[in-house]
């Protein structure tokens, strides 16, 4: 399912924490990792100066050496590798290389400070989510700063074991569900399917209509569970009332989900944020890894 993955790195402590998780993806079917480093245009502005060209060559050589060491470490763990250094806008280059290499998934990291503080998502990762037609796995880890040192605590074990799939039953949400149905091959043992009745909408409905919506939506959830059973995936269903992102994060914690898999719709995350920001808030606030699957809206 995720045989070929792309791992972009800037060699930071945060990227190294995600790198340490890559061998665990072998249980999800990963066999090959394409290691990518992007020299950002802001790092070495190109011009006609020989000095700039020389600086670019030195930076590229250094990155190639780091990638070579990383590749040897992965090969020692039984993964095949390839490496590449490119120059340009990091997010756009990551998406371009992912398409050229025909990878099945992009793996990146988000950083946080503690279980009680917001997970911070870097601009590059956010832009990749906005641009990539390929599924993106955002790994999560906690950052501890002590005595001037940065330590990243891994939280990536058994990533695909118990998957939470929030759905609004839309055509777009089918994009993620179609991936979820295939996750048994990635080691998934259970799927939790969640639908949240948005309190901002439902508070304007009469009680009898709310009861009708609950009955209809529970029937939809049970149908999805039966669909998953055809793929030999046990499933439990939850119907909640409240703010969708808040309920999703709460269920993820209560049920000890190891991954949240959901769709991002539209042509940009800005569009999604304007209609409620459920996806954006889950990605930013979740302490669990997030698998984002893009759905292009039809026009």
Task: Tell what function each PLM region has.
Residues 1-52, 156-207, 211, 227, ...:
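Small/aliphatic-rich secondary-structure junction motif
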Residues 1-4, 24-28, 96-150, 250-299:
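Gly/Ser-rich helix-loop-strand patches that form or flank binding pockets
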Residues 18, 66, 93, 176-179, ...:
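Well-ordered alpha-helical segments embedded in enzymatic catalytic cores
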Residues 33, 81-83, 136, 191, ...:
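Hydrophobic anchor at the start of a short beta-strand
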Residues 53-65, 209-219:
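A short acidic, glycine-rich active-site loop
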Residues 74-81, 230-236:
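A short helix-to-beta-strand connector/capping loop
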Residues 85-94, 239-247:
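Charged docking surfaces used in two-component/phosphorelay signaling
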Residues 204-262:
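Glycine/small-residue-rich hydrophobic helix-like segments
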